[in-house]
Amino acid sequence: LGFGGGLLALSLWRRGFPVRAAHRVIAKRYAFLALMGAVHMVLLFWGDIMFFYGVAGIVIAFLLRKRDSTLLLIAYILFALCALGGVVAFISGALDPLGVVATEGIGTIESYPNLLLSQLVTLGSQVLATPIILLMYLPVMLAGFVWARQGVLADVPSHRPTLLRWVALAVVITVVIGALWSLSTLGVIAQRWANAANNANSFLGVFTGPGILAGLALVLQPIQERLSAGAPLPAVLWPFAALGKRSMSGYVGQSILFFCLVHPFTLNFGHDLGAFGQAALAFAVWLVTLIFACVLEAFDRRGPFE
């Protein structure tokens, strides 16, 4: 979303928008995203991310005049604070022999009115915690914003070292946290390591976002070069491009599908499935959104939330 904000800023600049007008346009769009996130959080899914992305986007809207070096300095300072928080959280979890990842209460609310009340309380707590949570979301969006302004993904060869460093960082975080969490959950190592990994992931997980984007840019560079030369989009990538154009509809659509499937007051399905079964269920839900996006693409229609 930070990358998208950067592209929007470039588009406004090319069209001759004054800086103040660009501030208003970008802030307005991200304010609407935050509003959609708040509604999504209360009505469907307490784990919404659009609200915080929207708030972070509003902050970025008023940093348009800042140089890329200044924005990156702010991002790296915030990343450093996130890393410090992750280390402290990891140590805290590892030192607690009784620590567990509390998931038992998720998905057990018996009625929709009670769910609405619970998620309204969640929204209130999230609003109060916004300054702290922005510590994790803002640096990722700032990095994406600068990448868009610098054309990082449009000129992968020139920025390959930067992209490779982000990929390496994402791989290390994913492997270390994932290994500790899974081994602890399987009973191979003490349960406290799952709690430690969960704590660390709350802070360090944001580092994997730029790494995933960087990895995709590196892998798809040859295809991007052919597209730039006028070649058609490969058929195998067409469905993913269709969903990418409708990413918000896909995101909210997954919440709607899971809402219908898993709550005790809906179909109450999936609670007894093992890890593989739940992964298969998640894949099936994603596949439905992919097919829906393909249908919309075939008829040249935007997603309902775009």
Model-based region annotation:
Residues 1-5, 32-44, 173-181, 242-269:
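Kinked, hydrophobic transmembrane alpha-helices enriched for aromatic residues
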Residues 1-50:
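Membrane helical hairpin/interfacial module
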Residues 2-7, 49-64, 132-155, 204-225:
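Specific transmembrane alpha-helix
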Residues 18-19, 35, 88-102, 114, ...:
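Juxtamembrane/transmembrane-helix boundary motifs at the membrane-water interface
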Residues 42-59, 70-76:
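Hydrophobic alpha-helical membrane segments of integral membrane proteins
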Residues 59-77, 146-169:
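Solvent-exposed interhelical
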Residues 77-149:
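Long hydrophobic alpha-helical segments that form multi-pass transmembrane helix bundles
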Residues 189-301:
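Alpha-helical transmembrane segments of multi-pass integral membrane proteins
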